[in-house]
UniProtKB/Swiss-Prot annotation:
Family matches, as Gene3D superfamilies: 1.10.530.10
Signal sequence region: 1-20
Protein source organism: Mus musculus (Mouse)
CDD domains documented for this protein: LYZ_LA (cd16898)
PROSITE patterns recorded: GLYCOSYL_HYDROL_F22_1, GLYCOSYL_HYDROL_F22_2
Glycan attachment positions: N65
Xref: SMART domains: LYZ1
Entry GO terms, CC: extracellular region; protein-containing complex
Gene that encodes it: Lalba
Name recorded for this polypeptide: Alpha-lactalbumin
Keywords recorded for this protein, A-Z: Calcium, Disulfide bond, Glycoprotein, Lactose biosynthesis, Metal-binding, Milk protein, Secreted, Signal
Tissue specificity note: Mammary gland specific. Secreted in milk.
Length: 143
């Protein structure tokens, strides 16, 4: 039994580390810089919206009003992505909702741009009450 414990620890410690999915304000700002200014929405506004929407967690999943919202941008399976929980989705973004849960954000940003073009920033409910003014706190200040 004594030989089993060290062997077990070696096996556990040799497993690959999982990449963190909760990002910082600066990492988010850098990762989504291509959406800055799109439809008139600044990077500071996005940093605020994403903090209040998903807590900068790329794997956030929230059930809300009969649909499920996925990822950093909290994109709903009711209209925008396809999920097994809501198979009748319009899937306007043409993407599996599961793809919105990885750390590859290009597809998330492309879908967010579609939502922004169709619905506007008010799609993200945090925008008006939390992110329409006093945005300097969302600026990334790298030392």
């Amino acid at each position: 039994m004594m030989h089993f414990v060290p062997l077990f620890l070696v096996c556990i410690l040799s497993l690959p580390a999982f990449q963190a999915t909760e990002l910082t304000k600066c990492k988010v700002s850098h990762a989504i810089k291509d959406i800055d200014g799109y439809q008139g929405i600044s990077l500071l506004e996005w940093a605020c919206v994403l903090f209040h929407t998903s807590g900068y967690d790329t794997q956030a999943v929230v059930n809300d009003n009969g649909s499920t919202e996925y990822g950093l941008f909290q994109i709903s399976d009711r209209f925008w992505c396809k999920s097994s929980e809501f198979p009748e989705s319009e899937n306007i973004c043409g993407i599996s909702c599961d793809k919105l849960l990885d750390d590859e954000l290009d597809d998330d940003i492309a879908c967010a741009k579609k939502i922004l073009a169709i619905k506007g920033i008010d799609y993200w409910k945090a925008y008006k009450p939390m992110c329409s003014e006093k945005l300097e706190q969302w600026r990334c200040e790298k030392p």
